[in-house]
C-alpha cells in the first residue's frame, strides 16, 4: 500500500502551525485574534509552507524607531485589547503611536516575552522536522518501488 507522503507531511506542519498559535496565545499576545486567523498552512502540489501576517517580525523581534504607525491601527489594537479585558483609553492612541515612532518597540518587554515563533521553530525542532520529512519521503519511495 503506497503512503501519501504529502498528507503525512501536512500533519507534521499542521502540528507546527498549531504550536505557533498556542505560543502566541500562551504569551498573552492576542488582541483581535487576526494573527491566529492569518497563520495558515498552505499546501499545493509538492509544496507546503506556513504563512503569517507581516507583523510577526515585530512580535518576534520588536520594531525599530523611525516611523509612527497609523493611528487607526493603534485605535483598533486598543479596542481589541479592551475586548480582552484591558482598560486602555482611546485617547492613549496618539501617545502610543508617537512613542512607537520615536523609540520603536523593544522585545522582549513586560507585555511581550518574545519568541512567539522562535521558541517553537527552534533549531532542534527544525532538525526533528527534517528527519521526519526525510523518513516519510524515504518510505514513500520504498513503497512506490515495491508496488512496481
Functional labels for PLM-detected ranges:
Residues 34-148:
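Charged, low-complexity interaction tracts
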Residues 1-42, 47:
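Charge-rich, low-complexity N-terminal segments
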